[in-house]
Amino acid sequence: MKTFVAKPETVKRDWYVVDAEGKTLGRLASEIASRLRGKHKAEYTPHVDTGDYIIVINAEKVTVTGNKAAAKTYYRHTEFPGGIKSITFDKLIVRKPEMVIELAVKGMLPRGPLGRAMYRKLKVYAGAEHNHVAQQPKVLDI
């Protein structure tokens, strides 16, 4: 029996919309990352982007458990000496709610060009509205 290898031009990609309201951040992000990679499909091939497009709505209503809202810290660097910046989860969810889900999912995707291609298929919106109605996304319950 010959091993099946998916071809990038023959992969069928669907659009799904996920409501993040009341969902736990890590559990939601791991399922989204798995869908972006295409691991739920029978034709999954590790070196080919076989994943679907995922639209996340209500990103501002995602939750974390325990004390993580005050304790979880996100770091970035300005590339200048002494330029490390930090912000906690509860401040970031108010300022840029999309970034919380994007960073969680991005950390679960592979590094390199293939991971960046998978990450580009993620669309995150703070509110309940999105502008991908033309793609006719299906509702995905996670």
Swiss-Prot record:
The molecular function GO annotations come to:
mRNA binding; structural constituent of ribosome
Please verify whether the record's keywords include Ribonucleoprotein.
yes
Q: InterPro entries of this UniProt entry?
A: Ribosomal_uL13, Ribosomal_uL13_bac-type, Ribosomal_uL13_CS, Ribosomal_uL13_sf
GO cellular component entries:
cytosolic large ribosomal subunit
Print the keywords alphabetically: Ribonucleoprotein, Ribosomal protein
List all membrane-crossing ranges.
none
One record GO biological process = translation
Q: Name one Pfam family in it.
A: Ribosomal_L13
Quaternary structure, from the entry? Part of the 50S ribosomal subunit.
Q: Hey, which family's this protein in?
A: Belongs to the universal ribosomal protein uL13 family.
What is this protein for, i.e. what is its function? This protein is one of the early assembly proteins of the 50S ribosomal subunit, although it is not seen to bind rRNA by itself. It is important during the early stages of 50S assembly.
Q: What is this protein called?
A: Large ribosomal subunit protein uL13
Q: Which organism is it from?
A: Vibrio vulnificus (strain YJ016)
Encoding gene per record: rplM
